[in-house]
Structures are given as C-alpha cells and as structure tokens.
Amino acid sequence: MRPFQLDLLFLCFFLFSQELGLQKRGCCLVLGYMAKDKFRRMNEGQVYSFSQQPQDQVVVSGQPVTLLCAIPEYDGFVLWIKDGLALGVGRDLSSYPQYLVVGNHLSGEHHLKILRAELQDDAVYECQAIQAAIRSRPARLTVLVPPDDPIILGGPVISLRAGDPLNLTCHADNAKPAASIIWLRKGEVINGATYSKTLLRDGKRESIVSTLFISPGDVENGQSIVCRATNKAIPGGKETSVTIDIQHPPLVNLSVEPQPVLEDNIVTFHCSAKANPAVTQYRWAKRGHIIKEASGELYRTTVDYTYFSEPVSCEVTNALGSTNLSRTVDVYFGPRMTSEPQSLLVDLGSDAVFSCAWIGNPSLTIVWMKRGSGVVLSNEKTLTLKSVRQEDAGKYVCRAVVPRVGAGEREVTLTVNGPPIISSTQTQHALHGEKGQIKCFIRSTPPPDRIAWSWKENVLESGTSGRYTVETVNTEEGVISTLTISNIVRADFQTIYNCTAWNSFGSDTEIIRLKEQGSEMKSGAGLEAESVPMAVIIGVAVGAGVAFLVLMATIVAFCCARSQRNLKGVVSAKNDIRVEIVHKEPSSGREAEDHTTIKQLMMDRGEFQQDSVLKQLEVLKEEEKEFQNLKDPTNGYYSVNTFKEHHSTPTISLSSCQPDLRPTGKQRVPTGMSFTNIYSTLSGQGRLYDYGQRFVLGMGSSSIELCEREFQRGSLSDSSSFLDTQCDSSVSSSGKQDGYVQFDKASKASASSSHHSQSSSQNSDPSRPLQRRMQTHV
C-alpha cells in the first residue's frame, strides 16, 4: 500500500476519534500504530470478502432489528457507518446504547443490532473492514411509525340539536407513513368524508385530518360513530368513537279521559313528555289563562260547556325550549245561545230576516216557528219572511234541540208597519138604564193618528158629548178606545156604532152593536132552570108551531096571489113582492117618521140579513125588466113612461173603491150614515184630514146607493156582515138607466092607502129634484 493511503487512514481514525469524543492524542496514536502494524500483516497476501452484507429492512418503531455483516477469517476492526457517520470502532458502541455489535468475532461476524428501533434509526447503514480495506453495500433501514390515537373533536359525546346536520372531525397525527382514516357506523363504512395531510418538521412523519358531514335525516339519537386510523405500522389501525346525543325540546302528548263526558263531570288531563335534556317545568292554561293549581303531569277538573270550545293547554319546558299542546273536551251540553236574535220593525211588503246562532254537543237542530203555530218555518240559523203582511206580525220562536241532552229557545217580535187592525167584538152588552161601554181594540204600527166613533148623525173622537164619552188608553198590545154611554135607553140597542182608526198607512173600521144584557141573562137562566122533560115538551111545541106557521103561510100566500091578480096598476113578480117606484115631493114630516120606522124595522128584522137583501135586489131587477115589456093594462089609466135621472142624491156619495190594504176576511156591516157630512162638519172645526172613505149602505136618503159587493156566504153566524169589494164608480138609484113607471097623483093617492113602506130624503130642501120612493107590497 502506498504511504499516502496510510496517512489517509490515520486521518480517518483521528476524525473518528473526535466524533467519539476521544480527547487523548496518545490513544489515537497507539490505534494508528496498531492498525498500521496489523495492516502490514494483512497486506502480506491475505484477501478478505463479505459473506453477509446488510440488507434493506423495514421495522416498526419500537421493535428490534439486526443488520448483518460477516467477513470470514477477518479478525481486524469493523466499522459501522450510519448515513456516513461512524458509530464506533469494533464492538465498542457505547455512545449508542441501543446499538450492539453481535456475532462470533472469531468467525468474522460483526452484526449491528438495534434493540428498539426509533424514528432516528431510519437511515442508510454500511459495514466497513478497515484492515481489509473493504466495505459493504449500503442498506436502507426504514422505521415505520404508527399514528397517534385518533381523536374526534367534541367526543366522546357529541350533543346535537334536533334538525341540525352533524359535522365530525377526526385527526391522526405523527404517523409514518401518513395514516388512512375511515368512518364506521354499525360496522359499515360511511362514505363522503374529506381528508387533508400535513408533513411534520422532521420531514418523515405526517398528520391527517378527516371531516364527515351527516344530514339530519341520517342521524339517530344514541348512535355511535367510529373513526379508524391505519398505516403500515399498524395494519389493524387505531380507532375512536363518539356517541350522538340529539337534544330537543319536549315532545308532548296530551290526553283527556274520559271522553265524551256530560257537562259537570270530572275529567283528567295527562301531559306526558319526552325531552333531552330533562323537563324542567309543566304549566297548564285554559284559553290563555294560567291554571295555578296545576303544576305536574296531571290535571283534574270538572268540565262545563266552555271546555268544548276553549282548549286546555299543557306547556312543557327544558333547557332547549318549550312545547305547548292543547286539547278540547268532547263535552255533551244543551243548546247555548251565541248570537241573540233581534226583534224587527218593517214596513208592509218588505222582507224580514231573523237570525239566531246556537251551539250544542252533539249536533243540534234549529227550528223556527211562529208562536201559537205548529208550522216549521225554517231549520236554518236564518229565517227570512218575504213581503210580510200584517198577519205575519207577532212572536217568533227560534228553538234549538240537542237530542237526549236538552233544548232552548228565544222569542223575537215582528212588528209590521201598516194600516190599523181593529179586532173588537162586534156585539157587546149593557144593561138598560145603566151605564154601558163599547170597547174598540186597535192594533196599529205606527200608532193611530186618529180614532173616531160615529153613530147616527154623531161623531166623537174624545171627550164628552151629552150622554156619550170617549176615552183612549194605550196598552202594550195596542190601543183601547172606549165609548161610554150613560143612562142607556132602548134606542141605544138599536143603533149601529162605528169605530174607525187611521194612521199614515191607511185606516180600518169596525161596526159594533149593543145588546141588552138583562134579556139574554133571563133567557139563559130560564133555559138552565128547565129540566130535560120540559126541553122535550118545548121542542115538540116549537115543531108543531113551525108546522102550523108553514101551513098558514102557504094558505096566505095562495090567497094573496089570487087577490093580487085583480089589482090594477100593479105588476106581478116571481117572488110575490111588488115594487112601486113613484116620484114624490120630499119634506113631509110623516115621511121622515115612516123612514125612521123602516130603518128600525130593517134592523129589527136581522140587521140587513143577506138573504133579504139578495131577494130584494133580484126582485128589483126582474120587475124592472117586466115593466119594460108590459103593455098598459089600464087602457091609459096609468101612464107608463121610461125616463133618465141625471141628478144624484147629494146626501150619499160613493167614491170609487180603492184597493183595501186591510187584512182580507174582515167582515163589515153598513153604518147607516154618510161620513161625507160628518167629515165636512169636522173640517169646519179646523181639522184637516184627507182620508179615503168607504161606505156600505146609506139609509139617510130616499135612494139606496149600492156598491157592488160580494156577500160572504160562509159567515152566516153574523147575518149583518158582508165583505167589501172594489167598486168602479158611484152607483145610486138616481143614476140607473132603466125604465121606471110613473104614476099620476090619483094612483099615488090610492097606492099610498095600501100597506107600504116609504123612504124619504134626510134633507128637506124643497129645491132638490123629485126623489123616487120604493114601495114594497106583499
């Protein structure tokens, strides 16, 4: 070997000695000397080679590892080099206690053993034989470092508010190589995680972070989620887990027992709740008002009808919030009014709408009826009356019925603005010689403007006139006008009294007769005193009397018929009633008396009985027709002429009948007088009224004015009443166009000597035209 090579070798040992911290120069010199001597001996022809060289190895941190180095028959020094630096000479590696040179030295084995591999052992190693001047190939020792235990941020229990998504972060640090992280739930891998790696300062280790997002629908309370980190150092990996704690406000269930329940019975409310975190408070309320006596899960109370519509609420509170739940109770109760119906005031012909609202449980039925009637008008909350009439006025009832529970009703009043309605008794009674009263009851909305009593030629509205006094009293039902007559005489029982009321909608009239009370009472008492046999006897006697009268009437009629055929100047009629119409000067006192007698006779004979009037009208028509067709049977003794009378009677005037606004079916009786003169008299006293007048039959004139009428034949109980109908024009006896027979003075004188009835004018004005007089012969 060349000398410079030896110098280089000595220099290496010097440097090595400094690396080992050898400070004694003498030691190095001795080593150098020894090596030089040994080298000389080895260089004398001996050749050495490696039988074993170090190989690349991978070791997990903390595990032992051995790097092989064997040189057969070499007993010199062996030097182990780590990343270019000598670890020590020979077997002395005291500076690295984790390193040992092992093997049989005599056999040339110089293995390097690392007792516990660490990250700093990760390097390139060489084995060198100094005296033999050989070195091994470099060997790579790779040290694997497992990751630290993975950590899930926020673990081991992660609290999550219900409805929020879950974000988990797991990191595994200080791994070589970098760890791999997977997420597991119930043993299954959860995909969708994201990763990030970070290289540490040593340039060998790495840290990894994984983030997992889970939607709210995939998260369950109490679920465990695992983070597992693995690398080559730990194939089984390391893992950690977290438990999901889903927190939520209370979940409340409110129950009521028993249901359904009758009113005034006890029920129990049970408020059960699940909450995370735990419940801290219960609060009960009804219709927003706190129930102070209830504070726990249960609330017992006695229910009434309000619990059906006003719910009871239970509010449960925990750290996250409150939950409120309400329940009504299926309470059975009778009808309760929620909207009161209102009484109405409407005009005639308008619509009336009533409304009432009820509640009840179970479902109720509503019925509208008019008080006193069994007719159901409506089953709805609303009752509508179209085009109301006066007879629609009255009390209406809204009735509600809850089956098997109860019923209720409300009453309202319908008031109809219209003409007055008089509903007095048409026949009233009084005692002869005593004070008597005739009452006229008037229903009127609006109240009557005027009430007047009229009889004969008298009209009285209020106050006293002679024996007569009028008083008017207002009551809740209507107005009562009373005509009081003092010291009643017989003529008062033969007088027709007229009560008339007016308001802005029209008028109404009632005809009232006064009957003697004593005679009827005596007659009634006599009948009651009679026994049954006496009644039988009277019946037989009456029957016999009637039969006798019928027989006599037949004989008389037969005889009269024979005798009348011989009379001159008389025309025969079908009903054996002869009518003579003559002209006569008025103003006779006797005629006035006769006229009064006729009126009295007509009243005494049934108060204008319908049958008699009908017969007289028919006879008049038939006789007038026959008069027109007859020839003069007296050969000129009587002058038969037709004429036209253009002058109407001034004392009685019938205006065209106007439509009657009064309720139909009301019966009327002729008043026996003209209101034209009455109201003319009233107007002279400064009272201005413009009321349409309707009159039935005038009896204060020599003419009989007849308005076309329809007799109500079904109401025979009151023979003096008949129904007013429309009249197109004024009709009087002087306005007829039929022919009449005019008798001369002689014939009138002879005719007046026979049995007849006369009618004269109320007025005795001699300037008035001749009036015709109706004479009836039987």
UniProtKB/Swiss-Prot annotation:
Residues 1-21 form the signal peptide. Disulfide bonds join 69-127, 170-227, 271-314, 356-398, 440-499. Glycans are attached at residues 167, 253, 324, 498. SMART domains: IG, IGc2. Residues 727-778 are annotated as: Disordered. Expressed mainly in adult brain, bone marrow and stromal cells. Expressed in diverse regions of the brain, including the cortex, hippocampus, striatum, olfactory bulb and cerebellum. In brain, expressed in pontine nucleus neurons (at protein level). In hippocampus, produced in both the dentate granule neurons and the GABAergic neurons, but not the CA3 neurons. Expressed in subpopulations of vomeronasal sensory neurons. Expressed in a subset of neurons in dorsal root ganglia. Belongs to the immunoglobulin superfamily. Synaptic adhesion molecule required for the formation of target-specific synapses. Required for formation of target-specific synapses at hippocampal mossy fiber synapses. Required for formation of mossy fiber filopodia, the synaptic structures connecting dentate granule and GABA neurons. Probably acts as a homophilic adhesion molecule that promotes trans-cellular interactions and stabilize mossy fiber filipodia contact and subsequent synapse formation. Required for the coalescence of vomeronasal sensory neuron axons. This is Kin of IRRE-like protein 3. It comes from Mus musculus (Mouse). The lineage of its organism: Eukaryota, Metazoa, Chordata, Craniata, Vertebrata.
